[in-house]
Amino acid sequence: MSVALEQKQGLIAGDGLLPVKMAQYAKENGFDVVCISFSKDNLSQLKKYCSKVYSCHPGEINRIEQILKDEEIKQATFLGKVNKSVLLKLYKFDSRAIEILKSVKRLNDDEVMLLIVREFEKLGICVLDQTIFIKNLMIPAGVLGKHKPTEAQMEDVNYGFWLAKEMGKVDVGQS
């Protein structure tokens, strides 16, 4: 699926270097990045590449929605890790967050993320594929070492890939 990119991009940033790299690449390619950061770890780095950086807790839904509306964000990318220990600080959840979470059947990562995407869509915001602005960091498809895997080894790789995706769906530990 190809999507026409807006000049102004929203970035919902968790911990780590990926949100910073996304903002850097986007800025270098003429995009204006407005960031809502859930992390204090990379805040100073994000400020180098984003025109605005708002520090929020994931449970401040009313504030996040207002920022997105005020900034006229039409497209957003989620990048970076948000620890469940941060997410589960219930005292930081506003009434809108509690209302949204009540509609979740299970609090696994996939279900919560799909719910967030649907909420963004209700606001008229398209959640973009995470790889759009970081393709330059991705390993190309194909053989990476000196030896091409045998057919049996490729079957193992494909099975492992399928299994990791299935484990992610049911929220079983590190997949």
Task: Label each residue range with its predicted role.
Residues 116-129, 137-175:
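Internal active-site segments that recognize and position negatively charged phosphoryl groups
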Residues 3-38:
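N-terminal basic/disordered segments at the start of proteins
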Residues 25, 47-52, 89-94:
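Glycine-rich loop at the start of a catalytic domain that most often binds anionic cofactors/ligands
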Residues 64-132:
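N-terminal glycine-rich phosphate/adenylate-binding segment common to multiple enzyme folds
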Residues 38-58:
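N-terminal beta-loop-helix "entrance" segment that forms/cooperates
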Residues 13, 17-21, 56-63, 107, ...:
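Conserved active-site and cofactor/substrate-binding residues in soluble primary-metabolism enzymes
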Residues 5-8, 29-32, 50, 71-74, ...:
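Short coil/turn connectors at secondary-structure junctions
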Residues 19, 40-44, 61-63, 84-85:
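Short gly/pro/ser/thr-enriched loop/turn and capping motifs at secondary-structure boundaries
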